[in-house]
Regions:
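Short, solvent-exposed loop/turn segments at secondary-structure boundaries
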Residues: 44, 67-68, 108-113
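Mobile genetic element proteins and their domesticated derivatives, centered on retroelements
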Residues: 1, 34, 55, 61, ...
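C-terminal domain-tail junction helix/linker
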Residues: 10, 29, 122, 127-129, ...
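Active-site beta-loop-alpha junctions of metal-dependent nucleic acid enzymes
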Residues: 48, 66-93
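Acidic/histidine-rich, metal-coordinating catalytic segments
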Residues: 90-112, 135-137, 190-192
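RNase H-like polynucleotidyl transferase catalytic core
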Residues: 98-101, 113-143, 161-163
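An active-site-proximal beta-strand-loop segment
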Residues: 33-64, 74
Length: 204
């Protein structure tokens, strides 16, 4: 009957074709941001919840980490202010931040607040920073920060315990320092700090 034209053919679904990866060419061009929930097994107080906010510069892989006890748009906005200042002290101007579609970052999938910017989005706008959202349910588009979290699990959370937010923050800062000084294959076995220093020298 379809051949006789008695039923309309269903429109073929448009196939998603991934865009080629955009390689960053200088520090601060795009920074991936995400949140890692600290494993319960690492926290001494059963009532305490801890979260690691992570920013990673796509070009240099230089990371900034911060400890929070809430995963919400207020924490995200505070983290954005801190990461911008932290990178600026190292000579990097953040132009764009890339996140997933979590409610701590955007109201994109909120039924009632879809057209209302979150505090994170409002802060990005105030700071003149572009906020890019990845394709829904596609964490690989934030692959650098996702891979860094797997390294955190292996090198940090598998062998550390935390008794308070302050204790977690102190240990996380030490872990960040080690991470930024660790050689990386994508950087030709330079650490993020060394790679950034070599770029600055070449750019002069």
């Amino acid at each position: 009957m379809k051949r006789l034209g008695m039923f309309k053919r269903e429109k073929a679904k448009k196939r998603y074709v991934p865009k080629p990866y955009e390689q960053m060419t200088y520090p601060g061009q795009r920074v991936q941001v995400d949140v890692k929930v600290v494993p319960r097994s690492c926290i001494a107080d059963p009532e305490l919840k801890l979260y690691q906010y992570t920013a990673i510069d796509e070009f240099s892989r230089l990371r900034f980490l911060a400890a929070y006890c809430e995963q919400c748009t207020y924490s995200s906005a505070d983290f954005l202010e801190k990461l911008v200042a932290w990178y600026k002290r190292r000579g990097i101007t953040v132009e764009c931040v890339q996140t997933d579609n979590g409610f701590e970052f955007t109201n994109r999938f909120s039924a009632s607040k879809r057209n209302i910017p979150t505090l994170f989005e409002a802060t990005a706008f105030r700071l003149g920073i572009k906020h890019k959202l990845i394709r829904p349910y596609t964490p690989r588009h934030n692959g650098k920060v996702e891979r860094s979290h797997r390294e955190d699990q292996k090198r940090f959370y598998s062998c550390h315990s935390f008794f308070s937010l302050a204790d977690f923050g102190g240990q996380l800062a030490a872990h960040q320092s080690r991470s930024n000084n660790r050689p990386s294959r994508p950087l030709n076995w330079l650490s993020p700090r060394e790679f950034l220093a070599s770029f600055s020298v070449q750019d002069v």
